[in-house]
């Protein structure tokens, strides 16, 4: 490290500020993409377009492909549809905390967190609670900052996501992410 917060050997930016900035861009883009695929216009999500470098574009594409695969998992969709959003903050933080409760951090779980946040945002759009959208995005980024930032830094920044998902097949990744989220939702329902 040269003190700049970036790894000199191409591992990607690992400063806290850069990880949070990239995380916010990825989350916003992921949620906008999910809303667009649902046919929903989401003016609440429209922000000024931010120029993305090649690495961020690759990360966005990776997240989109995983999201597409997760959308086709009917068991996961059924469980998410059954989530009661009367107290969305409690639901979000309980499910998010449960995903990482065993202390094992990995990119599959980070993607599952983004996917769950996008589903809560889409529920807010469908139920006409647009003020909840920015709030959910804020919760996700707060959780990322408080619980995941150090781990993402240790992985060399967001570029570690591409390395992680570059090795297994998409089907394996999708099954893993869906499993983590399904297990978290099941535990939450039993506790709730």
From Swiss-Prot:
Span(s) of short sequence motif BH2: 150-165
GO molecular function: BH3 domain binding; channel activity; Hsp70 protein binding; identical protein binding; lipid binding; protein heterodimerization activity; protein homodimerization activity
Naturally occurring in which organism (per UniProt): Homo sapiens
CDD domains: Bcl-2_like (cd06845)
Residues recorded with modification N-acetylmethionine: 1
Domain notes: Intact BH3 motif is required by BIK, BID, BAK, BAD and BAX for their pro-apoptotic activity and for their interaction with anti-apoptotic members of the Bcl-2 family.
Gene Ontology biological process terms, A to Z: apoptotic mitochondrial changes; apoptotic process; apoptotic process involved in blood vessel morphogenesis; apoptotic process involved in embryonic digit morphogenesis; apoptotic process involved in mammary gland involution; apoptotic signaling pathway; B cell apoptotic process; B cell homeostasis
Short motif BH1, span: 98-118
Name by which UniProt lists this protein: Apoptosis regulator BAX
Purpose: Plays a role in the mitochondrial apoptotic process. Under normal conditions, BAX is largely cytosolic via constant retrotranslocation from mitochondria to the cytosol mediated by BCL2L1/Bcl-xL, which avoids accumulation of toxic BAX levels at the mitochondrial outer membrane (MOM). Under stress conditions, undergoes a conformation change that causes translocation to the mitochondrion membrane, leading to the release of cytochrome c that then triggers apoptosis. Promotes activation of CASP3, and thereby apoptosis.
């Amino acid at each position: 490290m040269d003190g700049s917060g970036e790894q000199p050997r191409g591992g990607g930016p690992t400063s806290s500020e850069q990880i949070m900035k990239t995380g916010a861009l990825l989350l916003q883009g992921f949620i906008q993409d999910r809303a667009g695929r649902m046919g929903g216009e989401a003016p609440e999500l429209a922000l000024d377009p931010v120029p993305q470098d090649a690495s961020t574009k690759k990360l966005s594409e990776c997240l989109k492909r995983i999201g597409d695969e997760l959308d086709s998992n009917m068991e996961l969709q059924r469980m998410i549809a059954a989530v009661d959003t009367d107290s969305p903050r409690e639901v979000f933080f309980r499910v998010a905390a449960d995903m990482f409760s065993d202390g094992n951090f990995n990119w599959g779980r980070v993607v599952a967190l983004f996917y769950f946040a996008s589903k809560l945002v889409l529920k807010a759009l469908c139920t006409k609670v647009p003020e909840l959208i920015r709030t959910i995005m804020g919760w996700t980024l707060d959780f990322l900052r408080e619980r995941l930032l150090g781990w993402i830094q240790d992985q060399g920044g967001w570029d570690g996501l591409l390395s992680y998902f570059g090795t297994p097949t998409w089907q394996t990744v999708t099954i893993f992410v869906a499993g983590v989220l399904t297990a978290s939702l099941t535990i939450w329902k039993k506790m709730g």
